[in-house]
């Protein structure tokens, strides 16, 4: 989303589970692997990545309803698509996903959330495959979730997940989604080259939001090359032209150092 990044040794798009498992079994176990979702929360180096980038294809992009209140979604399904599917099936609890521009797999990996809700609030279980091709199912109660993280192994590739909603009415759900959308558009930049919130809120250290700390500590007109701080939300950094990876890292480091100095 920053429109920044270099090349990798191998880029592999898996069309289905069988192909993915076969590919993993052929890889050297020491090979570095990076799973690319929507790329909406990713800053990629301009340097060559000496490893394998894997992206899951269309057969990991299915959504289905099981029973009255359980949804099964592939890991490359967009968060927005899951929220809309839930609304169509009169299930609430997924409205917050409308504000997250990522995939189900990425959302689980970082326990993504907004508007006071997180993935762990709706997750029942995940299906994943490890680096050597073993497919496993993990119940959410076996996962230790924290703010924007969990204890799942970095070696796992998420395939799909099951979620539980609450029966409601589509018009009520739609009204809530419209309210959240308006709130997001009012407070956050959209349709620009950004990767969303850069820093996590320091929930264990202060009640202040990270944007408040940045606003109090950093000259907001600071830039490096074409890497800028958003005028609309100072925890959003923007590529206004041809910013490089180094430009963005310099801006991130500059903001972090100034906040640490003054708090």
Describe each model-derived feature in a short phrase.
Residues 1-104:
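Anion-binding (especially nucleotide phosphate/pyrophosphate-binding) glycine-rich loop
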Residues 2-5, 28, 35-36, 44-47, ...:
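Solvent-exposed alpha-helices and their adjacent loops that cap or buttress functional pockets
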Residues 5, 12-17, 43-61, 109-140, ...:
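Structural signature of FAD isoalloxazine-binding scaffolds in flavoprotein oxidoreductases
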Residues 42, 129-258, 262:
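Phosphate/pyrophosphate- and phosphate-bearing ligand-binding catalytic cores of soluble enzymes
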Residues 77-80, 110-112, 141-146:
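Short acidic (Asp/Glu) patches
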Residues 86, 104, 108-112, 127-130, ...:
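Short, well-ordered alpha-helical segments in soluble proteins
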Residues 87-124, 194, 200:
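A gly/ser-rich beta-alpha-beta helix-loop segment of oxidoreductase catalytic cores
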């Amino acid at each position: 989303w920053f429109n920044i990044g270099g090349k990798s040794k191998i880029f592999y798009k898996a069309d289905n589970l069988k192909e993915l498992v076969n590919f993993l079994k052929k890889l050297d176990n020491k090979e570095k692997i990076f799973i690319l979702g929507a790329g909406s929360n990713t800053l990629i180096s301009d340097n060559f990545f000496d490893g394998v980038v894997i992206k899951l294809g269309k057969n990991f992009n299915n959504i289905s309803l099981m029973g009255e209140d359980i949804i099964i979604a592939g890991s490359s399904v967009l968060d927005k698509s899951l929220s809309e599917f839930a609304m169509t099936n009169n299930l609430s609890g997924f409205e917050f996903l409308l504000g997250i521009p990522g995939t189900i797999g990425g959302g689980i990996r970082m326990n993504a959330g907004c508007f006071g809700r997180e993935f762990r609030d709706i997750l029942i279980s995940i299906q994943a495959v490890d680096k050597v091709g073993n497919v496993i199912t993990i119940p959410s109660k076996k996962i230790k979730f924290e703010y924007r993280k969990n204890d799942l192994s970095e070696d796992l590739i998420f395939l799909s997940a099951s979620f539980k909603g609450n029966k409601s009415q589509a018009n009520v759900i739609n009204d809530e989604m419209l309210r959240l959308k308006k709130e997001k558009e009012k407070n956050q930049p959209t349709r620009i080259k950004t990767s969303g919130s850069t820093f996590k809120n320091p929930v264990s250290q202060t009640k202040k939001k990270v944007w408040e700390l940045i606003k109090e500590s950093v000259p907001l007109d600071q830039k490096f090359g074409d890497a800028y701080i958003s005028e609309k939300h100072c925890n959003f950094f923007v590529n206004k032209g041809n910013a490089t990876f180094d430009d963005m890292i310099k801006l991130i480091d500059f903001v972090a150092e100034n906040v640490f100095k003054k708090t």
